[in-house]
Amino acid sequence: MGNSNRGCPFLKQTEIQIGIFGGKYKMNYTHFVSVAGLVYNENEEILLIKSPWRGWEYPGGMVEPGETFQESLIREIKEEAGVDVEITGFIGLCKNIEKDIVNIDFSCKYIGGELMTSNESAEVRWVKKQEALGMVTFPLTKKRLDIMLSEDNRVHCFGFKKEPFGIIAEQDFMVGKV
């Protein structure tokens, strides 16, 4: 098993063997998975944090080894904003095709706790949806926020490149059987 860090302590190269048609094939994977949540409160405001790196965004972060997506999201929101949430829906996913980073987006309901900052959030606040659209400026974060706020009951998937930001492929899917 190799270790190709590329700057992220959680991004490790893992070699696995799979059996296809009776044969053994070695495949190297270096994917990193993150989760993010659009958190609504009882006033239909959404939670934004001010990241030192990307400016205003919704909370989220890395899926750590041994965690489910849901556990990771609940932990990240608590760490970054100090609040407890209930995950209410799956919104979609996107992939950075240059760095094999997969981002998974959920909707959440605020259930308790006091807003507080952390080393990953210089500011934390509840804002109206329209205000949020003006505050978020990082291109990928803005694209994902537009999708999160669409409320069209579809699952959104897209691939992108980051420098310069551009959508490579995009598709929306109906939820359930069609």
Which positions does each model-derived feature cover?
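A short coil-to-beta-strand element that immediately follows conserved catalytic motifs
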Residues: 84-92
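Nudix hydrolase/Nudix homology domain
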Residues: 56, 122-178
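Conserved N-terminal beta-strand and adjoining loop/helix that marks the start
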Residues: 23-46
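Targeting/processing segments of secretory and organellar proteins
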Residues: 2-3, 19
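Cationic, low-complexity basic patches in intrinsically disordered or flexible, solvent-exposed regions
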Residues: 13
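Active-site-adjacent beta-strand/loop module that shapes the phosphate/pyrophosphate-binding cleft
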Residues: 33, 95-115, 125, 129, ...
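Conserved Nudix-box catalytic region and its N-terminal flanking loop in Nudix hydrolases
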Residues: 41-79, 172-178
